[in-house]
Curated annotation (Swiss-Prot):
Glycans are attached at residues 72, 104, 110, 129, 189, 198, 216, 260, 446. This is Protein croquemort. Disulfide bonds join 256-324, 285-345, 326-334. The lineage of its organism: Eukaryota, Metazoa, Ecdysozoa, Arthropoda, Hexapoda. Residues 34-451 are extracellular. Macrophage receptor for apoptotic cells. Up-regulates Bfc, which in turn leads to self-up-regulation by Bfc in a positive feedback mechanism in response to detection of apoptotic cells. 'Croquemort' means literally 'the one who bites dead persons' in French and is colloquial for undertaker. One of its GO terms (biological process) is apoptotic cell clearance. InterPro entries: CD36_fam. It is a multi-pass membrane protein. GO terms for cellular component: membrane; plasma membrane.
Length: 491
């Protein structure tokens, strides 16, 4: 029997000893585990070989889709009739699976890494509404670019260019398959002529025109990125320091020309859900500020939605801090709110970007053409990011590309046409966190809580031991006597 092999003192030592040990361990866990857990999570999120973040950064672990919606210009022959608006019919989506892979990366001692990113696209017919052979009519981008570059030249120069446009295939509009409009590109007589007999006046840097021609599988198209790894300060994780080796883009006046923000695929943990976030868009050679607007639930995670607002694509009309995105010398010519000029960035072509269907843009752009139906649910640009870990949960990067067509009596092709910002296409870059990665994110979020719960459980367990010991001591019942023991004591 226990009472015969273990005395009262020994039992007290065991009960009070174990109770004290569990109590001490529980208190230590409750006090110190949150800091330890935070360090473990932050270490796993830093960009260095061996971490999960590093592996996910090297090659995107989730499918990314890029959907194109083309605008088919149905009445180009009426462009000189001021009573008839250009009419556009949306076609698509034409969806591509997008693969990202970091290459030629170099880690530096100042907690940064420089790298190129190769992006590859594969057409996904099942997610598309149409084929790449669908025909689309749109404004002739090469002709528009040449005319725009020559607009302020002397009359004699413009006469020569007008002759060239008339005899080398210059057109107001062109009809081509979707595939050629996007990645394949199409051969053009004007492009051939300018590449053969080029002058310093007109620079056409490509042999085939396509909105993303020469981009598929290109290593260098997006440029050289340098970002913070977060190894010295986790709050800097993913922040862009240089693009193509420079801290300024050279395309806009400061401070709009600064290389700022993240590339959109990595954010630091412990984000302030009341602050704006900044992403750098290489296609526009500029940063974009997104504002927090509510939350988004997915896979059991609660993410904060950061969205594009009226300020995001304003050029100073309503938000003076954005004025440096347009040339001060010709501020009166700057686009109205919701549309930004990309001419300097996009090979001098008269390209302007907006949100799809001119969502959040000045109403005049919507009214100038037929077929625009801006809707928040379909056309809002947003990133949903889990703020504790900085993990993107869902992304819809939606941008529309437009081209300016305007009259010029020195060019036969543009004589008498309406001045209109023509929608060409819009795209939606979409990605969603997988359930597997969401589970890892939830573990990281709750790791501190799990430890605290375990610590309090140990404290509760220790309390049972100690309360039991105190109770037995007060009632003097440490040794439970059996009838046999009573007989021994009474005889």
């Amino acid at each position: 029997m226990c009472c015969k092999c273990c005395g009262e003192t020994q039992r007290k030592v065991w009960v009070f000893g174990l109770g004290s040990v569990f109590l001490l361990l529980g208190i230590l866990i409750v006090v110190f585990w949150p800091g330890i857990a935070d360090n473990l999570v932050e270490d796993g999120l830093t960009l260095k070989p061996g971490t999960d973040a590093y592996e996910s950064w090297l090659e995107a672990p989730i499918p990314i889709y890029l959907s194109f919606y083309m605008f088919n210009w149905t009445n180009p022959e009426d462009i000189r009739n001021p009573d008839i608006k250009p009419n556009f019919v949306e076609m698509g989506p034409y969806t591509f699976l997008e693969k990202h892979k970091k290459e030629n990366y170099t880690f530096y001692d100042n907690a940064t890494v420089a790298y190129y990113e190769r992006r590859t696209w594969f057409f996904d017919p099942e997610r598309s509404n149409g084929t790449l052979d669908d025909m689309v009519t749109a404004a002739h981008a090469i002709t528009a670019t040449v005319a725009d570059e020559m607009r302020d030249q002397r009359k004699i120069v413009k006469k020569i260019i007008n002759f060239m446009l008339n005899h080398e295939g210059g057109k107001l509009y062109v009809t081509k398959p979707v595939g050629e409009w996007i990645f394949e590109g199409y051969q053009d007589n004007i492009t051939d002529f300018l590449n053969l007999f080029n002058t310093t006046k007109i620079d056409i840097p490509y042999k085939r025109f396509g909105w993303l021609a020469d981009r598929n599988e290109s290593l260098t198209y997006d440029g050289l990125f340098t970002i913070h790894t977060g190894t010295d300060d986790i709050s800097n994780l993913g922040r862009l320091t240089h693009w193509n080796g420079k801290s300024e883009t050279g395309f806009y006046e400061m401070p709009c020309g600064i290389v700022n923000g993240t590339t959109g695929d990595m954010f630091p943990p412990k984000m302030n859900v009341n602050d704006e976030i900044t992403i750098f868009a290489t296609d526009a050679c500029r940063f974009m500020n997104l504002r927090p607007r509510g939350t988004y639930e997915n896979h059991g995670l609660t993410a904060t939605k950061w969205v594009g607002t009226e300020e995001t694509l304003d050029s100073g009309e309503n938000y003076p801090n954005q004025a440096c995105f347009c040339d001060e010398a010709r501020f009166d010519e700057c686009p109205k709110t919701g549309v930004v000029e990309c001419k300097a960035c996009r090979d001098k072509a008269p390209i302007y970007s907006s949100f799809p269907h001119f969502y959040l843009a000045d109403q005049s752009y919507v009214d100038a053409v037929s077929g625009m139906k801006p809707e928040k649910e379909k056309h809002e640009f947003f990133l949903a990011v889990e703020p504790i870990t900085g993990v993107p949960v869902q992304v819809h990067g939606r941008i529309q590309i437009n081209m300016m067509i305007e009259p010029d009596d020195d060019f036969d092709i543009y004589r008498g046409v309406q001045k209109v910002l023509m929608p060409m296409f819009w795209f939606d870059q979409y990605a969603e966190l997988s359930s597997e990665l969401a589970s890892k994110a939830k573990l990281a979020i709750n790791l501190s809580s799990y430890g605290i719960i375990f610590g309090y459980s140990m404290i509760a367990f220790a309390s049972v031991f100690l309360i039991t010991g105190i109770t037995l001591t007060v009632t003097k019942k440490w040794v439970r006597r059996t009838p046999e023991d009573e007989d021994i004591l009474t005889n």
